[in-house]
């Protein structure tokens, strides 16, 4: 697209946080025709009965007025419920630990929002994510953000060529302290606002309380693989593989961890020791594969992978089983690989794509107890 910046309309998703505020400021300073959109994805009130979305939208209004750009609020609650929240509940019901942020980016921020932006005459959408897009060798590549500590390509792993061709990440070359400083210098209302944490629709609330509103808890037995009962669990959906806190097992010796789930018998398996071999897998079957590139993949190739956000890169060999499934062979056993989570593939700074962890093996044996 050879338009000049002032002829190029960029619709930016604004959350009311400092990152998207500075991203909007940068686009405006670069001369683009910028429109701010606040996405209302969840009908939400906090413990005090305050609608947090209203507070966030008020921050968006204030920042947009400061920058001098128009703004709108768009309601995506139905799409979010259908595409993200239903998936979230289904995964927990199946005893897995989902990653709703990946699905939200795929289905809402870079699909429903992108379609809405194009209807507004947008040439591009932008967000405050820490990632980069580059056009090289005839296609779009997604690269890690320069700030290693904040890089968000893990959550963006399902984006396609079509989506990336319409996307700008203004913060990709910056580090978080620089962004805070820019917000402060510009006097933005969100300059000192703390970063949001946790799953977007739960916010700061207690996860267990939230989930119990939608899924009936089924308490059961907590035991070792040899059958020694160590207590009761509150419901398998509340525990993730490798979890230490909340088990309530006293006594001396090494701490206890959740090492597996038996859905049929509603048993939570536990064992002692952070480095317990029951927590380590060296082979993974992953499904719902999405590649950033449209180029045909080799049947087998080496790269690195992250099995959770902020994990170090692990050397792996990826084998293509079919267009929806890959087998991942790890050079070294990896702790607490969790079904339902995303595995994301990298070649240096380039994010190649990702998939959903489905089955975990150790030395050729499926870890059935992972549920």
Swiss-Prot record:
Q: Where is the active site?
A: 104, 200
Q: Any idea of its EC number?
A: 2.8.1.13
Database matches in InterPro entries: MnmA-like, MnmA-like_C, MnmA-like_central, MnmA-like_central_sf, Rossmann-like_a/b/a_fold
Q: Per the UniProt record, which residue ranges are transmembrane?
A: none
Q: Which GO terms describe its molecular function?
A: ATP binding; tRNA binding; tRNA-uridine 2-sulfurtransferase activity
Q: Which residues bind ATP?
A: 13-20, 39, 128
Q: Which reaction does it catalyse?
A: S-sulfanyl-L-cysteinyl-[protein] + uridine(34) in tRNA + AH2 + ATP = 2-thiouridine(34) in tRNA + L-cysteinyl-[protein] + A + AMP + diphosphate + H(+)
* Keywords carried by this UniProt record: ATP-binding, Cytoplasm, Disulfide bond, Nucleotide-binding, RNA-binding, Transferase, tRNA processing, tRNA-binding
Concerning PANTHER family, the annotation shows: MITOCHONDRIAL TRNA-SPECIFIC 2-THIOURIDYLASE 1 (PTHR11933:SF5), TRNA 5-METHYLAMINOMETHYL-2-THIOURIDYLATE -METHYLTRANSFERASE (PTHR11933)
State what protein this is by name: tRNA-specific 2-thiouridylase MnmA
Q: Which organism is it from?
A: Bacillus anthracis
Q: Which gene encodes it?
A: mnmA
């Amino acid at each position: 697209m050879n338009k000049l910046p002032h002829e190029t309309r960029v619709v930016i998703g604004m959350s009311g946080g400092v990152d998207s505020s500075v991203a909007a400021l940068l686009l405006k300073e670069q001369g683009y025709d910028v429109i701010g959109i606040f996405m209302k994805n969840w009908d939400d009130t906090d413990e005090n009965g305050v609608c947090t979305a209203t507070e966030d939208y008020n921050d968006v209004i204030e920042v947009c007025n400061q920058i001098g750009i128009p703004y709108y609020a768009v309601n995506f609650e139905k799409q979010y419920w259908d595409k993200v929240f239903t998936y979230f509940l289904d995964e927990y019901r199946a005893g897995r630990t989902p990653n709703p942020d990946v699905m939200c980016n795929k289905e809402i921020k870079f699909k429903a929002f992108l379609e809405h932006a194009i209807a507004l005459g947008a040439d591009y959408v932008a967000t405050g994510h820490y990632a980069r897009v580059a056009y090289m060798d005839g296609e779009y590549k997604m690269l890690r953000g320069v700030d290693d500590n904040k890089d968000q390509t893990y959550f963006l792993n399902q984006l396609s060529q079509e989506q990336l061709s319409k996307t700008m990440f203004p913060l990709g070359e910056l580090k978080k302290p620089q962004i805070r400083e820019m917000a402060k210098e510009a006097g933005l209302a969100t300059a000192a606002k703390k970063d949001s944490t946790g799953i977007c629709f739960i916010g700061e609330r207690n996860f267990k309380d939230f989930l119990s509103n939608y899924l009936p808890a089924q308490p059961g037995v907590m035991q070792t693989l040899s059958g020694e009962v160590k207590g009761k669990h509150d419901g398998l959906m509340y525990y993730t593989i490798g979890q230490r806190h909340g088990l309530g097992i006293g006594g001396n010796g090494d701490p206890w961890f959740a090492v597996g789930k038996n859905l049929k018998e509603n048993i939570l398996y536990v064992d002692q020791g952070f480095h317990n071999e029951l927590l380590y897998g060296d082979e993974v079957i992953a499904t719902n594969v999405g590649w950033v590139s449209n180029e045909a993949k080799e049947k087998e190739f080496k790269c690195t992978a992250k099995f959770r956000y902020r994990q170090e890169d692990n050397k792996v060999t990826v084998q293509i089983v079919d267009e929806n499934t890959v087998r991942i062979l790890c050079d070294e056993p990896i702790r607490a690989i969790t079904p339902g989570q995303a595995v994301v593939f990298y070649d240096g700074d380039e994010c190649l794509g990702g998939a959903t962890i489905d089955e975990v093996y150790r030395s050729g044996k499926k870890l059935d107890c992972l549920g």
